[in-house]
Swiss-Prot record:
Keywords: DNA-binding, Homeobox, Nucleus, Transcription, Transcription regulation. This is Brain-specific homeobox/POU domain protein 3. A motif (POU-IV box) lies at residues 55-65. PROSITE patterns: HOMEOBOX_1, HOMEOBOX_2, POU_1, POU_2, POU_3. The gene is BRN3. One of its GO terms (molecular function) is RNA polymerase II cis-regulatory region sequence-specific DNA binding.
Length: 341
């Protein structure tokens, strides 16, 4: 009899004894109660035995929940929160986030009414666990039994990260405005200025090399001498757009200074060249050249008074007009000679 009683005591009563770690026992039993479907309980052959066990577990879980209210940051409470979220599809974390999370759960998951007693506590812990912006933490819904809900939570975090990054669009716009150029110059305006600059430079009798070397005398910060090829490429519009935009105000400043010096009849060699006494080749712009050709067709040998009138009308020097007529007559003679022989 003693051996039978000892066997009965060994087989019937060890589960009802006080466990060694009551908090871990109550936590595991509460999770088992929340995740265990009702059909499994009814179909169990030890239904009566399990009901007695579950009643005791519910009583211990109720005592544990009361203790959680006094200690909200207890490790067991955090364990309840993180675990019951992954097991219960009707938990509060589903209602706090995007509706697409609802569609990612498996259809065989059922709604369990016994877990509703824990949802009041879950709301408090989830609200305190959520970071700023409503994005769930990395531990929420990350159990391997729900891969679809885990992926939907990751997608939801990526979906909400864009508004957080763009929370200050006006700040980004202000940086974009500062980094870009202050004023955008129209290419047609650059082309018009390049043609106008070339004509006015020719009227002043200044070569492209003289313009490049005279820019250093303007004392513009960051601007030194430029090569003749740079001025030539500017006039022919073969520089890049950014270089054209940067060079335009510099050449405008030089042109204004040179024309002011000519109007005042002041000799400022530093604007042109630094003491070069060599006679320079005179260039005539296309409009003036067409006018001279028209005068030459009417009168190849104009008088001195006529040459002076033409020079004044075209804003050219009298000697330049006289030399052009002389050169044009020599050119006509060469053309007639080559046609004869």
């Amino acid at each position: 009899m003693m051996s039978m009683n000892s066997k009965q005591a060994f087989s019937m009563h060890p589960i009802l004894h006080e466990p060694k770690y009551p908090h871990l026992h109550t936590s595991s039993e509460a999770i088992r109660r929340a995740c265990l479907p009702a059909p499994q309980i009814q179909g169990n052959i030890f239904a009566g035995f399990d009901e007695t066990l579950l009643r005791g577990a519910e009583a211990l879980a109720a005592v544990d929940i009361v203790s959680q209210k006094t200690h909200p940051f207890k490790p067991d409470a955090t364990y309840h929160t993180m675990s019951s979220v992954s097991c219960t599809p009707t938990s509060s974390s589903v209602h706090l986030h995007h509706p697409s999370v609802l569609t990612t759960h498996h259809p065989h998951h059922h709604h369990h009414q016994p877990a509703q007693g824990l949802e009041g506590e879950l709301l408090d812990h989830l609200n305190s666990a959520l970071p700023l912006g409503g994005v769930p933490g990395p531990d929420v819904g990350s159990t391997p039994s729900h891969p679809h809900s885990h992926m939907s939570a990751i997608n939801h975090m990526a979906h909400h990260s864009q508004p957080m990054n763009m929370s200050h669009p006006h700040g980004l716009a202000s940086h974009a405005v500062i980094s870009g150029p202050e004023t955008e110059t129209d290419p047609r305006e650059l082309e018009s200025f390049a043609e106008r600059f070339k004509q006015r430079r020719i009227k002043l009798g200044v070569t492209q090399a003289d313009v490049g070397s005279a820019l250093a005398n303007l004392k513009i910060p960051g601007v030194g001498c430029l090569s003749q090829s740079t001025i030539c490429r500017f006039e022919s519009l073969t520089l890049s757009h950014n270089n054209m935009v940067a060079l335009k105000p510099i050449l405008e400043a030089w042109l204004e200074e040179a024309e002011r010096a000519q109007r005042e009849k002041m000799t400022k060699p530093e604007i042109y060249t630094g003491g070069d006494k060599k006679r320079k080749r005179t260039s005539i712009a296309a409009p003036e050249k067409r006018s001279l050709e028209a005068y030459f067709a009417v009168q190849p040998r104009p008088s001195s008074e006529k040459i002076a009138a033409i020079a004044e009308k075209l804003d050219l020097k009298k000697n330049v007009v006289r030399v052009w007529f002389c050169n044009q007559r020599q050119k006509q003679k060469r053309m007639k000679f080559s046609a004869t022989y």
